[in-house]
Amino acid sequence: MNETRINVDPNEIAKFEQLAHRWWDQEGEFKPLHDINPLRLEYIRNHASLAGKRILDVGCGGGILTEELTRLGAKVTGIDLGKAPLSVARLHALEEGLEIDYQQISVERLAETKAGSFDVITNLEMLEHVPYPASVVAACGQLLKPGGKVFFSTLNRTPKAYLFAVIGAEYALRLLPKGTHDYHRFIRPAELETWCRKGGIELQNLTGLHYNPLTQRYRLGKDINVNYLAYGAKKE
């Protein structure tokens, strides 16, 4: 099985292609991404220096995180397999006067030619949308420089996550379009740690991301049973 060629779900690509024109609408379907972006950025900045670094944003979509990393002085490459989201990302970066290298390529394919090229890799809200997340993690390990850091955010495969992230977020509160997530693709931290270890990455931290429906605000915390962020470092 050649995961480099088939590690993509056409239904997932089609889903985000249809919504691509709404990517920068802060009150639209991607509102949760806009809302959590400051926390994601805070987490990354707390664990890695960014200015002047070469950063790869895997599954960059329309570029919400990518642009902020660029504004902090990093040289950023954003990759995605969706053509429409990348078109939106390129146009928005042009409007903002930002130089970002956007490419329509898989992380596995990029690793074939750019091994050891990046100081920092971000892989946020992406692993749960591909058939073979372990392949993505392995490619991240190949692309990192020794000592480089990789950041993940995904959903834990727990009953609480199903209740909050699927039933609550997609059906009750309608924070996300129905069908955004497939519970069976959620990832337990132990699974992520195993994939990282096999890829030469030492996982160093897990932090929960919590949503309060009463205040409609997000915060970082200790509970990793629903959404969580993680970072690891490639062995020197």
Swiss-Prot record:
Gene3D superfamilies: Vaccinia Virus protein VP39. GO terms for molecular function: 2-polyprenyl-6-hydroxyphenol methylase activity; 3-demethylubiquinol 3-O-methyltransferase activity; polyprenyldihydroxybenzoate methyltransferase activity. The keyword Methyltransferase applies. The keyword S-adenosyl-L-methionine applies. S-adenosyl-L-methionine binds at residues 40, 59, 80, 124. It catalyses: a 3-demethylubiquinol + S-adenosyl-L-methionine = a ubiquinol + S-adenosyl-L-homocysteine + H(+); a 3-(all-trans-polyprenyl)benzene-1,2-diol + S-adenosyl-L-methionine = a 2-methoxy-6-(all-trans-polyprenyl)phenol + S-adenosyl-L-homocysteine + H(+). Its EC number is 2.1.1.222, 2.1.1.64. Keywords: Methyltransferase, S-adenosyl-L-methionine, Transferase, Ubiquinone biosynthesis. It is an enzyme of class 2 (transferase). It comes from the Bacteria. CDD domains: AdoMet_MTases (cd02440). Pathway: Cofactor biosynthesis; ubiquinone biosynthesis. GO terms for biological process: methylation. Disulfide bonds: none annotated. O-methyltransferase that catalyzes the 2 O-methylation steps in the ubiquinone biosynthetic pathway. Belongs to the methyltransferase superfamily. UbiG/COQ3 family. This is Ubiquinone biosynthesis O-methyltransferase.
